[in-house]
């Protein structure tokens, strides 16, 4: 038996246990959102208390994620379009240095509030390990829904509607 086979067989139970524990820790729909604090690149601070009465869209992304880059333009568009209806969009970069993110944003600007992972505990709370991940928190501070992976604009709009956001009737230009 090769060393690789032995390693795989011996580590599999540990990995399964770790995955199970992570799954148990992830907040579920209709549960209260975990207490958090996030500071944007412009110095704005967001907490559970500061978003009460609004709908929050937490977008977990990275600079190397192709799906994140593909979806960024419509995510930003939705964030801007629905801000007057009470939507707060926080784009949380996961696992990269501020220098890396700033360099990326110089080349690929975003029209939303950017949060560095090192300035928040949100990524750990939502077991952000694949990207993008979208989490919607409703006006009462509960998880309205979560989407792991790219799903397109229509899927994101449906997720936001679950939080009670009054979406415009005309979304004919959505993907």
Model-assigned labels for residue ranges:
Residues 36-56:
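A short beta-strand-turn-helix
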